[in-house]
Every structure is written in structure tokens, then in C-alpha cells.
Amino acid sequence: MAKEKEHINVAFIGHVDHGKSTLIGRLLYETGEIPEHIIEKMRKEAQEKGKATFEFAWVMDRLKEERERGVTIDVAHRKFQTDKYYITIVDCPGHRDFIKNMITGASQADAAVLVMDVVEKVQPQTREHIFLARTLGINQIIVAINKMDRVNYDQKEYEAAKEAVSKLLKMVGYKVDEIPFIPVSAYYGDNVAKKSDKTPWYNGPTLLEAFDLLKPPEKLVDKPLRIPIQDVYSISGVGTVPVGRVESGVLRVGDKVVFEPAGVSGEVKSIEMHHEPIQEAYPGDNIGFNVRGVSKKDIRRGDVAGHPDNPPTVVKDFTAQLVVLQHPTAITVGYTPVVHAHTAQIACRFVELQKKIDPRTGQVKEENPQFLKTGDAAIVKLEPTRPMVIERVKDIPPMGRFAIRDMGMTIGAGMVLDLTPRK
């Protein structure tokens, strides 16, 4: 059997209306991932309407109409293949209230595609998303300079847009010479899957080729097992079935597992993915697993499964590098917002503001600051108000990132540098 392609998760980021959905739709269309029956239905309609040329753009218009009528074609975890990878799209829509998704979603992304309108260039969310991608440790980025059809595929316009976004990327510490900047029209398909004859001046990769230039994600297989629990079901005739995504390590049928902070353990009787039984589950797999010896009431969303010889770390407190994205006043010691880490949401108290740092260089700007405000980056110590599992970002990267929410908004994003395990 041929070696299976590696999986890679890609977040689509960028300002609202710069064309993320259209670009995602175009990629799915070009790679044959929009279900045939949908295409077929639209082909028929196209013929009836006398649109002999069945164009993707028309498909996108129809999908958009259906979305506006509240019918979403379910492409939530959307996947497509390139020559080298299976790619899962972690879509990060543009509006402000999606920043939390971006933080919880993007922390699972191995790379990001920044979609930017060639006319509008850098907009507020363009900045915010680049800043966040950086903070969340997304080190690989592809820039799609979209809507080239609006400027007649003019190289000067492309260069101006590239220059504007490069400044920003450099500022937060991306190596701009390693980033592909691709002039595309998601609507017409230029340089998405096929090189466009409208941009003879561009000799870089298409978007599809650029995915194959990404480095595969760090091997999380060799790290300790961690499965944050999303839901727990009790299935008659089967038993207790926790559901979650394997973030690190490998789970095998027959393994003993322990759930923290619940402190209960059991034996894995079976594992299922996409309704198929499997013998072992790897990082990135969304699974349900039947555990003997554990009842549904013992565990809940936010608990984490691991192996007994290297159990998930329950912390007394943790030290983190944090960026304050927005706060109406200022953060001081004693502030207790909700920390969203993996699937857990737990109120944590700020117990120390240790230092303010320059987010770009990491240099200390101020020791023991009195307060933190919007835009500040800092090292802080947080104390969960109830037992919580979190790991150092250097030990298990996906388990060491978190978002801070309060008052219905995302206050900040951070990563765990150190921790004190609970005795």
C-alpha cells in the first residue's frame, strides 16, 4: 500500500469580504471536493437558464444565495488533497466575534493562507489576524492577493499590495523572503489550481503548488497522549463513549487511559473515526472511543485523556506569554476572566504581572508592570479557580495555547511557558 499522505491543517485568515469563502470554494471545486450531486444540480440549472458555460463563479453565486437563505452546504471540516498532503481547512471567518474561533481554531493550524483584496489591501482584521497567527505559533504563511480581476491583473497593483502586507508581516517577525505572494482571482480561478495566462509577469507557484511547499507539522506522534474531550455519550449496548481530537501521542485499542482532572481511568474497548472502527488513532484524528470502567457522569467536556504513565498535567498555576488584543480599561492583578484552552473553559485569576515585553523582539520593556492594556504583550502568572489541565507549549504545543474571554469578547491570546503541577 502506498504511504498515506501527511495531514496538514490550514487556517484561512484575512479581513471580511476579501474573498476567503470564494477562495475555499474554488479550491474545493478545483480539487473535486464539492459533492457531485450539487454540481450536477447546478449544471442542470445552468442549462435551463441558458448558461451554457458552466462556470465555477456561477456555482459560488449559487452557494452564496443558499447561504443567505440560511442553507449552509456542510463543509465545516473541509478537506482536499494536493500531490503531497491531505489538507483540512480551518476556516476563520472575518468578523470580530470570530476571533475566538480563530484562537481556538488557529491554534490547531499548521499554516495559514492570508487572503487579501488587492484593492483594499491591509484592513484592521488583516492586521489582527497576522498578529494572532504569529502569537499562536503559526510559522508558515501563504499570501493570496485576491481579486486581481478587479485591477485587470496589473503587476503594479500586485506589487503595491505585496509591499503593504510585507511591512506588516516583517513587523511581527515573519521571514518575508520565505513567503509566497500569489496573485489570484478566486472568482475566475487565476493561479489557484492552474497558472494564469493573465499574469505572465508572475512566475511563482499557484496556490495549490504553494501548499506542497509547506513543511509538514512537527511530529506529535512521539509526544505523550493527549485527547481533550469535546463530548461524552452513553450508548446503550456499548457504554461510555468520549469524543475528541487526538492532539498528541497514539491511542490504541486495549490501552489503559486516565482522564484528568476527573481522576478516573478505564480501558479502551474500541475506537471509531467517521463511523468506521479503527485499531489506533493518531494526532489530528477526530474520534469516539469506548472506555470500560468509566461512567458518563465521571467525565465531561474539558477533561483530557492520557496514558497513566504520563498523565495530563493538572496545574496549580501557570506562567504564560500573553498578548492583550482588546480590553476596555486595563488588566491588573486579581482580574479573573475565562481561559479557553483546548476544550476547557475555566476562570483563571491573574496572580502576577511579571514583565511587559516587546512582542516583536521579546525584549523586556518593563518589570512588574502595574497594569496591562490593549496591545501589550506580557509574561503573567495565572491561577485556575478549579482544577485544569494545560501543558507547556514547548512540551506539547497544541495543549499549551489558550484564549482569554470576558464580556463577550476575546481579551487576549497566550501560550504556557511554565507551570506548577497540582500536588
From Swiss-Prot:
Keywords: Cytoplasm, Elongation factor, GTP-binding, Hydrolase, Magnesium, Metal-binding, Nucleotide-binding, Protein biosynthesis. The keyword Transcription regulation does not apply. Mg(2+) binds at residue 21. GO terms for molecular function: GTP binding; GTPase activity; translation elongation factor activity. Residues 14-21 are annotated as: G1. Pfam families: GTP-eEF1A_C (PF22594), GTP_EFTU (PF00009), GTP_EFTU_D2 (PF03144). Residues 91-94 are annotated as: G3. It catalyses: GTP + H2O = GDP + phosphate + H(+). GO terms for cellular component: cytoplasm. The keyword Transmembrane helix does not apply. Residues 146-149 are annotated as: G4. Residues 5-221 form the tr-type G domain. Its EC number is 3.6.5.3. Residues 70-74 are annotated as: G2. It is found in: Cytoplasm. Residues 185-187 are annotated as: G5. GTP hydrolase that promotes the GTP-dependent binding of aminoacyl-tRNA to the A-site of ribosomes during protein biosynthesis. NCBIfam families: EF-1_alpha (TIGR00483), PRK12317.1 (NF008969), small_GTP (TIGR00231). Belongs to the TRAFAC class translation factor GTPase superfamily. Classic translation factor GTPase family. EF-Tu/EF-1A subfamily. This is Elongation factor 1-alpha. The gene is tuf.
